Each structure stands twice: as structure tokens, then as C-alpha cells.
Amino acid sequence: MAGRQQELPTITPYLQETSPERAPSLPPKKKLRKNVQVPDRVPVLPPSPEVVPDSEEEEEEVVYTGFSHPGVQVVQKASGKRYVRRLEPKGVPPPSEENNEEEEPSTSKAVTSVVLNPQAEPLVSAWEKGMDLMIKLMEKYHVEAEEKNGFKFLPEQSNVYRKICQTWLNEEHRGLPLTFTSHKTFVEMMGRFLRAYVESYAGVKNNEWEPTGCAIWLHGCTEQEGVLRCYHGLEMIQKEQLVEMDVASENAQRALKEHPSRAKVVQNRWGRSVVQLKNDDARCCVEDVSCATNVFSAKSCGLFFSEGTKAQTAFLQIEAFMQAEYPKMQNGLKRLLMVMRCDCLYKPTGVPQLGRQMCKATPFALSNVDSLRAEEVTDKVALASIQYPCVLVYQCANPVYRNSRGGQGPNCDFKISAPDLLGALQLVRRLWGENVDGPLPKMLIPEFKWSSRLQYRNVALPASHGDGEKEPF
């Protein structure tokens, strides 16, 4: 064993060449050419898209809809989360807005556009804003529960506003003095003005319905003495008028008392005693020159004054009354707030009625004003009526007087004077200030412009009376 030689490890030449102890040397680096540009950054290829099966869209349920402009919907998903979705008008593509709502991670590619609230406050629609105010007023002024629960800003729900104003008047203004105005009509006009303020405050105004039934008329009846203008904007024609009234009627007794020189009791062609009143200063529309008394042409505006001087005095009275009430007024001095629609015409259908399409304007004389001395009165508002002792009164478009036969058209007991109409607006503003914080909303009353739609109607349109049957015969 001692003489045996030590054995050397046997390794094949191939293994010796590839062994890590004897790794082959790297090839020499090549020098880059000067004209070769090396990119600063190697572009990274996008990862291969993963194939994800399409997931079914979550079921959505509309909780409620807000009647704003544009409208909104509160939608609840199957997971219980809610978001607000805006309803775009027809023909307008929806805006591309991202949904920032925190949701559970989902692989669905469906994107829902929502309305983002930059102020991080709950969205309140115009309908909700108006309903909050109306609920407050209805609870405070004791509106019945049935009407309160069914209130939805519909045009035919005007009685809610009237009841609010009536309760407020009973609590705050008992014994309200009125001049040739019925209390019912005064409350009606207060309700209309209150409705206009509520709709303006909330932003739920209907463009097809004017709630006040009023207009601002640039009348031009005080620019020149003896010159009156009708609703066409043209000068009214002076002609003679002969009126016969029953002796027992209210108008006949008033004519005998106020105009003893022009009114007399005579017998008509049938042998009955009547009061005959002759008016030499009557004024009519230019379209009614050839018409008899109380007869109007198809193109007439329906405006007629039996005494032109008395009518101009009434226009001067309301002008002086407004100037005394608003001494800093700039634009409204020559304009008149007038009622266009009485209870007969205050309907959202817009169907013309038989007769006049506007309220009848009549000048009424203030009695016992001659006994007052202007130097003894310091109130400028009262001085306007002392200086011009006539007021303009708006009545039903086709009024029916006591002891007289009614006409074919509809009629009501609407009656309010021009000063009391302005007073109704003032009291509504006071009611608003007592119940709503902040500035008074701007109420826009349209300016009067003559339209052929307002012409006198001698023939009524065929009307439907309703029928529940499917077939007429």
C-alpha cells in the first residue's frame, strides 16, 4: 500500500472546459460609434391584457325623483348604496363625469355618470326647497291635513295660498279697510302674490302659467287732458251714450244721486218706468264706434268708459297714490298694476271665454270727499285721493249686477280697486318677511302687450262636458 501511487481525479476535457472554476472569458467590448444615438430610456412594453369575463350590471332602483331643472334621481344599487343621477333634457347628450363614489372593487367596465357636489353638501332640488317652505307655512297657519298632504305646486291648488293669507290676516290685521273691494277678492289676490313669491324663491316657476294674473300697463291716459287710450294703445273715441236702468236697481239709484242733472225717470216703449242716464262724454274703443251701447265688435278690446273725465281722474289718482307711497320710484310712475284675469279667467287651460278676456275696469267716485280740506290732511297718500276723488276698480270680465239678468258667459263676484291691489302686494311682502329669512325674492310681473287673443268673443268655442263611455253612440 505504501508503494502504491496516489490516484489523480479523472475529469473529462469537456467538463474541465465548462466547469465554473474555469469559466470562459467574456468577449471584448466593442467601442460604440460616434454617429450612433443611444436612447435615453428603453420603452417598456405594456403588459398583456388579462381576460376578464363580463360581469352582469348591478340592479338599480329609483328611490325618488326631484322636480328640478334639470331633474335628478336618487338611485339605489343592489348593494344598498345610493347616488344622485341627473336627468338630461331630450336631445342633449349627458356630460361625461367620473363617478367618485366609493364602491367595492369590481371588474365591470360599466360607467355610470352622476352629479358631483363640489361643496360636499346634500343636493336639494327646487321642488324640495319649495315644499319645505310650504310645509312650514301650512303647519303654522293651520291648513287642513288633507290639503297639506296633497299639495304638489299644481295650478289648481290656489286655495292653499288663500287659506294661509286668510289666517295671517285674522291673526295680524283684523278690520282691514278696503275701498270698493270685496274681502274675498282681496284674499284671492294676496294668495296669488304669495304663490308667485314662493315659486320664485324655490325656482319651480311654470313658464306656461302666470300665477298673479296681473300685468304692468304703460297706459298713457294721463299724458294729455281729455285723452284716454284703450288696450290697443290707440286714442279712445268720444260718443254719446244713453242708458236705461230699472228704477229699483242699485245703479239707477246711484245715477239719480250722483248725476241729478243727467238722470231722469221716464217711461220706455213698453210703458215701464226706468231711469234714463245720458252720457255725452262716453269713451269707447276704436273698433266699437259703430256699435250700440253694451255691444262690442269681434276686434274690440272691451274697454269702455261712460264718463271719460271720471276715468282720467281715476288714472291720476293711482298715479299720485303710487308717487306718494314710493317717492323714490323711477320706472313705475306712468305704469299701472292691473288685474287681467278674474276668477272666471284664472284657469290653466287658456281656453277663451265668451265676452271679455280681461277684467272690466270701471272708475268709481269717492263720496264725501268734497267736505275734506287738503290743508288739514298731512298724509300724502290720503291727499292723492282728496285731490283726485275717483278710483279705478277691476271687476269680473262679464259682471252681473243686482236685479239684472245674467248673460250667457261665466261670471263671478271679483272686485278690487287699484289702490287695494297694491295693498295686497304690500301685505304679502310683510307676511314673507315674518316667515322667511333673507332678502325678498324677485317677482316678475309681465308687461302688458296687446294680442289678438284678448279680443272680445261674441261666440264661444264648442266645449266638452266629459263622458266616461268609450263610444259616443
UniProtKB/Swiss-Prot annotation:
Subunit structure: Homomultimerizes on viral ssDNA bound to pTP. Forms a initiation complex with viral polymerase, pTP and hosts NFIA and POU2F1/OCT1. Interacts with host SRCAP.
Gene Ontology MF terms in the entry: DNA binding; zinc ion binding
Family classification: Belongs to the adenoviridae E2A DNA-binding protein family.
Protein name: DNA-binding protein
Primary location recorded for the protein, binned into one broad class: host cell
Gene Ontology CC entries for this record: host cell nucleus; viral capsid
Pfam family, one: Viral_DNA_Zn_bi
Biased segments, Polar residues type: 7-18
